[in-house]
Design a protein with these regions (language model features):
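Structured, non-membrane catalytic/scaffold regions adjacent to prosthetic-group chemistry
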Residues: 2-234
Length: 234
């Protein structure tokens, strides 16, 4: 196990201790999936094992790319009919979408009611036209594991990636997405743990076979379902 994974596990354990009282109270009374009123998907708003934060904690690999909108591009390829490289201008010319959704981090915190603006992932898929045998997506960020050329990657089933609330966002709460949170563009996956949404997104590949990403190769769950407490590979 590398140092990065050990640090992340220690962080999670600290969060559990800091919020032990509220978690213990909830655990005695909440349904197995979580607590709170049903969200728009019919599940408890707060997934099991999570606590609510009002700020937006920053977590990364230790590499925070400084990519201007003039430099930023999104390469989209793999098994598609029309591979493209989008500039910032191209990206903003695509149909824009707004959504309000919750953000669930595997490190046990959730932030509710985030107002996003960006491009739905399904719009990207429609643009490039995946081949019939495509079942998976691999997203790659501009960031790398420090001291290496290993980029951040994460995998998502195509069926999940093209859901209505999966976006490539450039705006949060009415302001440009902050650099520390993945700006100028990051992916968000509201029904999965947030590591499934690559920050500083740079490339998307459409694949026939699943390919595990950075954290998935290091012991994190491949499916990442917050309401199943699905944090680590079994």
């Amino acid at each position: 196990m590398d140092d990065l994974v050990e640090r992340r596990i220690r962080y999670i354990e600290r969060q559990k201790l800091l919020h032990k009282e509220s978690v213990d109270v909830d655990a005695a009374s909440q349904p197995a999936m979580g607590s709170g009123q049903p969200n728009r998907h019919g599940k408890p708003q707060l997934p099991v094992g999570q606590h609510v934060v009002r700020n937006w904690p920053v977590l990364d690999l230790g590499d925070v790319p400084d990519i201007s909108t003039d430099e930023w591009t999104l390469e989209v390829g793999g098994l598609v009919e029309n591979p493209v490289t989008l500039t910032w201008k191209d990206f903003l010319a695509l149909p824009q979408a707004e959504d309000v959704s919750d953000f669930h981090c595997v490190t046990t915190w959730s932030r509710f009611d985030n107002h996003w603006k960006g491009v739905r992932f399904r719009t990207i898929a429609e643009l490039v036209v995946p081949q019939p045998d495509v079942r998976h997506v691999l997203a790659t960020g501009y960031d790398h594991m420090p001291g290496t050329r290993i980029p951040y990657t994460t995998n998502v089933p195509l069926a999940r990636a093209i859901e209505e609330d999966v976006l490539l966002v450039h705006t949060w709460q009415g302001e440009p997405l902050p650099r520390e949170h993945g700006g100028p563009v990051r992916m968000i996956t509201p029904k999965l743990y947030a590591w499934k949404g690559a920050k500083w997104i740079h490339r998307v590949d459409f694949l026939a076979q699943d390919q595990k990403g950075f954290w998935e190769l290091r012991g994190y769950s491949n499916t990442a379902e917050p309401w199943a407490n699905d944090r680590y590979a079994s």
